[in-house]
């Protein structure tokens, strides 16, 4: 609430590294330093930061669009095995109560999302942007997709999870990747649109011509 109500929506990221990888070693011991915080101070962000941040925003603003992005949201966009808790977890979209995930680099999708919101479209109607993931209770308007195993199947059978992951991995190409649908007991569906197209040479030149701050 200190930030105030945004004009278009909240964009949420855990930073340039998954918060759990940032906080813990592979042996699950707490790290002593945070390389991505000024002074290397640990404890400046919570575990599972995207989930925490989004839920805090949702408790303060019930109807403001929340768009999650960055590596933490991207790698957890569909059901996934969480090494830290040794459990199969749902799409972060559901646990975070976010509206949309912008996955991957996001240079195109974030602009398209902003333009769509600025035009007055409701966040629930923005289902057509490549490089995004959204949730829906009906598949009536979803087309040309591959259906992944239901989340309940993944909990019960490791082989079904392996099959699901193979389909996901096989559809990461921006030119041939299909839309993927992951059901959750038939009550809600998480829909992953195909990956966003890569930047053109001119777009790439524009990005790297920006005045980035260097520390070396």
Model-derived features: positions:
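N-terminal [4Fe-4S]-dependent radical SAM core
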Residues: 166-216
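Glycine-rich beta-alpha loop elements in corrinoid/cobalamin-binding modules
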Residues: 2-185
């Amino acid at each position: 609430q200190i930030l105030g109500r945004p004009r278009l929506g909240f964009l949420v990221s855990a930073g340039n590294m998954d918060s759990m990888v940032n906080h813990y070693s592979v042996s699950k011991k707490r790290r002593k330093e945070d390389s991505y915080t000024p002074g290397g101070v640990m404890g400046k962000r919570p575990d599972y930061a995207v989930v925490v941040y989004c839920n805090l925003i949702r408790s303060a603003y019930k109807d403001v669009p929340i768009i999650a992005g960055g590596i933490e949201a991207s790698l957890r966009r569909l059901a996934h095995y969480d090494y830290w808790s040794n459990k199969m977890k749902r799409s972060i979209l559901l646990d975070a109560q976010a509206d949309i995930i912008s996955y991957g680099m996001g240079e195109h999708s974030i602009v398209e999302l902003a333009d769509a919101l600025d035009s007055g479209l409701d966040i629930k109607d923005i289902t057509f942007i490549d490089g995004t993931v959204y949730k829906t209770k009906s598949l009536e308007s979803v087309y040309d997709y591959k259906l992944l195993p239901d989340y309940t199947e993944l909990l019960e059978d490791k082989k079904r999870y392996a099959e699901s992951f193979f389909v996901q991995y096989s559809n990461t190409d921006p030119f041939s990747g299909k839309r993927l649908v992951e059901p959750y007991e038939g009550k809600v569906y998480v829909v992953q649109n195909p990956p966003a197209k890569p930047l053109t040479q001119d777009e790439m030149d524009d990005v790297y011509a920006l005045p980035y701050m260097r520390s070396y």
